[in-house]
UniProtKB/Swiss-Prot annotation:
Naturally occurring in which organism (per UniProt): Vibrio cholerae serotype O1 (strain ATCC 39315 / El Tor Inaba N16961)
Domain of life: Bacteria
Family the entry assigns: Belongs to the fructosamine kinase family.
Annotated EC: 2.7.1.-
Active site, renumbered: 195 (proton acceptor)
GO molecular function: ATP binding; kinase activity
Function of the protein: Ketoamine kinase that phosphorylates ketoamines on the third carbon of the sugar moiety to generate ketoamine 3-phosphate.
Cytoplasm listed as a keyword: no
Protein name: Probable ketoamine kinase VC_1539
Coiled-coil region: none
Entry-linked Pfam families: Fructosamin_kin
Disulfide bonds: none
Residues that coordinate or bind ATP: 92-94
UniProt keyword annotations, A-Z: ATP-binding, Kinase, Nucleotide-binding, Transferase
Length: 288
């Protein structure tokens, strides 16, 4: 694997890359990640089995469109490819620390709101299907938000659970209920990070950074709801966001529907206590 990476990196840079340092670094639960250096420049390398190339290709597109918005900082794409046995993605390496101070948190809130305001997309979805963690995230274009979220988010995850032999509710009935609950909410399509938990943001020398996106055009409230559910963000993050674009009336009820998508996905990936959490959240939503 490493000879292939070094060769492609040399070709991309237009000069020989001589590997003088390679250090394993934290990069989540899915990929094996490294910092590599030629003694001058440093790069962040994600690796996995060869079949993961489709995931890395999707991540490249996610990062591209977020960078195009010129609103938030994301890692710079260098290259991706495969060896005989592995797939890899190379980004610029950035020294990070937690996004835990008030000023930078507020700044990121402002940046996220500007990301959500960017663009003039008329429909909900994305140009490609991508991944939320290790799970395929289908993104066919829809004109109606309620239809998109009910079918391509909630219905999709419930179907994946059913294939595992788990039936929390009648899928068709619950999907129709979600459509009804969201029918009177007509958000403008916003470019979403899509997986905005505290572990996917950081602080670097020149400001906040976000990474590992699962982008699509959807209701901006989905990003905020997930940030609340996972926790870790400073209050100033939410204050910064609302200083630019206050949340709409009804968000407190909609956020449970939006976060159900992530709870279901966590069960489909990790199992365990997320099943009980999903059941309780479904019961809460049905009780409204």
């Amino acid at each position: 694997m490493w000879p292939a990476i070094i060769q492609q990196l040399s070709e991309q840079l237009g000069k020989d890359f001589h590997l003088v340092e390679k250090e394993k670094v934290h990069g989540g639960d899915i990929n094996e990640c490294f910092m590599v250096s030629d003694g001058i420049d440093r790069y962040f390398v994600k690796t996995n089995q060869r079949e993961y190339l489709t995931k890395f290709t999707a991540e490249v597109e996610n990062l591209r469109v977020m960078r195009e918005s010129n609103t938030v900082q994301v890692p710079e794409y260098i290259l991706h490819g495969t060896s005989k046995t592995h797939a890899y993605l190379v980004l610029n390496y950035l020294a990070t620390k937690p996004l835990d101070d008030a000023e930078r948190s507020y700044e990121f809130g402002v940046q996220l709101a500007n990301l959500h305001r960017w663009g003039e997309q008329k429909e909900f979805g994305f140009d490609i299907d991508n991944y939320i963690g290790a799970t395929v995230q289908p993104n066919p274009w829809h004109k109606k938000w309620a239809l998109f979220f009910a079918e391509q988010r909630i219905g999709w995850q419930l179907q994946l659970m059913q294939e595992k032999g788990v039936n929390l509710t009648n899928i068709n009935e619950f999907v129709e209920m979600v459509k009804t609950r969201l029918a009177n909410h007509s958000p403008r399509p916003s470019l979403l990070h899509g997986d905005l938990w505290f572990g996917n943001v950081a602080n670097i020398v020149n400001g906040p950074l976000c990474f590992d996106p699962a982008c699509y055009w959807g209701d901006r409230e989905c990003d905020i709801a997930l940030a609340e559910w996972f926790g870790g963000f400073q209050p100033e993050f939410f204050q910064g966001y609302e200083s630019v674009w206050p949340l709409d009336w009804g968000y407190e009820e909609r956020k449970d529907i939006y976060n159900l998508y992530h709870v279901l996905n966590h069960y489909n990936q990790f199992g365990g206590h997320y099943l009980d959490e999903a059941q309780k959240l479904i019961e809460k939503i049905l009780s409204y």
